[in-house]
């Protein structure tokens, strides 16, 4: 089960469009994706409502972990999305 902590760096944080992109990437993989402000209270990373309820603004540290088939690929894709500022160019 790969896991890591990552900081939200885009200007608007994990707002609706960014959350939709996150869930879209997570949904491409068959593994379980969990995300949260701390490892003990992670939510389903494939649920748009759960991801939006994190209210993760710029500078928020999030814990990501994946488990199951293609877990490494899923984690890498989500890290790339976050590090690319959700492709919002800011």
Swiss-Prot record:
The keyword Plastid belongs to this UniProt entry's keyword annotation: no
Entry-linked PROSITE patterns: PTS_HPR_DOM (PS51350), PTS_HPR_HIS (PS00369), PTS_HPR_SER (PS00589)
CDD domains: PTS-HPr_like
Location in the cell: Cytoplasm
Location of the HPr domain: 1-89
Keywords: Cytoplasm, Phosphotransferase system, Sugar transport, Transport
Pfam families: PTS-HPr
GO CC annotation: cytoplasm
Transport found in the keyword field: yes
Disulfide bonds: none
GO biological process terms, semicolon-separated: phosphoenolpyruvate-dependent sugar phosphotransferase system
Active site, UniProt feature: 15
Similarity comment text for this entry: Belongs to the HPr family.
Role summary: General (non sugar-specific) component of the phosphoenolpyruvate-dependent sugar phosphotransferase system (sugar PTS). This major carbohydrate active-transport system catalyzes the phosphorylation of incoming sugar substrates concomitantly with their translocation across the cell membrane. The phosphoryl group from phosphoenolpyruvate (PEP) is transferred to the phosphoryl carrier protein HPr by enzyme I. Phospho-HPr then transfers it to the PTS EIIA domain.
PANTHER family from the UniProt entry: PHOSPHOCARRIER PROTEIN HPR, PHOSPHOCARRIER PROTEIN NPR
Name under which the protein is recorded: Phosphocarrier protein HPr
Organism field: Pseudomonas aeruginosa (strain ATCC 15692 / DSM 22644 / CIP 104116 / JCM 14847 / LMG 12228 / 1C / PRS 101 / PAO1)
């Amino acid at each position: 089960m790969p896991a890591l902590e990552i900081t939200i760096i885009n200007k608007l944080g994990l707002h609706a469009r960014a959350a939709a992109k996150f869930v879209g990437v997570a949904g491409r993989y068959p593994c379980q994706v969990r995300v949260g402000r701390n490892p003990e209270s992670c939510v389903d990373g494939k649920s748009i409502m759960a991801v939006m309820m994190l209210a993760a603004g710029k500078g928020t540290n999030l814990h990501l972990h994946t488990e199951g088939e293609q877990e490494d690929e899923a984690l890498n894709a989500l890290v790339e999305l976050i590090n690319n500022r959700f492709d919002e160019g800011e």
